[in-house]
Amino acid sequence: MLTPERHQLIIDQIEKHDVVKIQELINLTNASESTIRRDLSTLEERGFLKRVHGGAAKLSDIRLEPDMLEKSSKNLHDKLKIAEKAASLLEEGDCIYLDAGTTTLHMIDFMDKTKDIVVVTNGVMHIDALIRKEISFYLLGGYVKHRTGAIIGGASLVAMDQYRFDKSFLGTNGVHTEAGFTTPDPDEALLKQKAIKQAKHAYVLADPSKFGEISFSAFAGIGDATIITTDAEELTFDNYQEKTVVKVVKP
């Protein structure tokens, strides 16, 4: 079987079954395990699939955006570990940006209010947590997305112009070596771009499920931010560590 034929067969199997095992592909193609692994690596780089332990899986819909309830209940343990690590990076007097999202929301619980930190955020859900923690903050104005509680749009971009940050902490829907960091909403991508540009240090908080995924709108290249994630048996970070810093937390 020629390589293009084999690649198409793999793509077809993933479209049909969502997840496919390496051994199943070996049986279907009569190719060696090393050949199938190379095929999966190539197809992942091209954005056709993402590799998982023992095989490959279908990518999510590039425009699909889960709501806050769905996000908050998914991979909670990983998100808490990532949030704790991110909060540990904060220093006395830091001015930071917290993106709207569940992991950045969890960060607030781990923040030390005695460090005199000032927060700028576009997260409506972050308001109560920041007030309870007695942390000084500024809320961007603009259009509020009902599904996620994120404030976006022209007004929020204009408001961002007046701020400069020591550190920005952002969520993402996709992390990919070639496509970079991506999100379903182009308006939200613009705000994330500005948050990275106006920070001395930018951090993307991503649990392992985000790796290999590509969403509709890119907001940064893979080398534009440090990644904070958790260790995962089925995932290797070698390709990412060639292009950026990856801080891996033990789950």
Curated annotation (Swiss-Prot):
Signal sequence residues: none
InterPro entries: Carb_Metab_HTH_regulators, DeoR-like_C, DeoR_HTH, NagB/RpiA_transferase-like, Tscrpt_reg_HTH_DeoR_CS, WH-like_DNA-bd_sf, WH_DNA-bd_sf
Gene name of the encoded protein: fruR
SMART domains reported in the protein's UniProt record: DeoRC, HTH_DEOR
Protein name per its UniProtKB record: Uncharacterized HTH-type transcriptional regulator FruR
Keyword terms: DNA-binding, Repressor, Transcription, Transcription regulation
GO BP, one annotated term: regulation of DNA-templated transcription
One Pfam family here: HTH_DeoR
Ranges for domain HTH deoR-type: 3-58
DNA-binding region: 20-39
The organism of origin for this protein: Bacillus subtilis (strain 168)
GO MF entry, a single one: ligand-modulated transcription factor activity
